Amino acid sequence: MKDGWLPREEWLKMLEARPASAAVLIENSAGELLIVKAHYKPHWGVPGGVIDAGETPLQAALREVAEEVGLTLRPADLTFYAVASRHSSEAMLYQFVFRARLDNERLAAIVLADGEIETYEFVSRQAVLASDQQFVWSIQHWAEGKLGGYVETNMKRDGNQRHETVTQYIAITKKEETWEH
């Protein structure tokens, strides 16, 4: 360290150690959530993936939705939902999660990515809560009707299964709070 600053190469290498991803919770007109099953994952998730170099979380979210389910979203279609700090023994990952509610006409344009997404379905909150299946934290929070905000998770692998536990949750605001300008 020179004069309190890390050498640029060390600083850049440190930044590479904390990758980030983006995902989108997409609801239909009935309030059901679009979930996808990738060929290479044992669990269901939502459209999303790693943020490429030079991309913002918003750009990555829009790109991943287009790549995985063939939907072209605009920034105005999205609202911010949450940011998560996901921890495992292998890595730490930031995940930026957005929400979109689309009419069924737009959702009729879904085309699955060849070789990546196996299938998709729309699920209700009740179906997620009643299921004994393990869902990623964002699907579980959506089903529980939790407000967005900040989330920390701990991910563990057990063979081919991944278990993710929320260890911290701070709501973006409380339902009774309002923000006045």
Where in the sequence are the language-model features?
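Nudix hydrolase/Nudix homology domain
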Residues: 42-43, 115-181
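Conserved Nudix-box catalytic region and its N-terminal flanking loop in Nudix hydrolases
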Residues: 28-67, 177, 181
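A short coil-to-beta-strand element that immediately follows conserved catalytic motifs
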Residues: 72-82
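Active-site-adjacent beta-strand/loop module that shapes the phosphate/pyrophosphate-binding cleft
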Residues: 84-109, 121, 141-146
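Short Gly/Pro-enriched turn/cap motifs at secondary-structure boundaries
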Residues: 12-16, 89, 112
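Acidic, metal-coordinating catalytic segment for phosphate/diphosphate chemistry
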Residues: 1-23
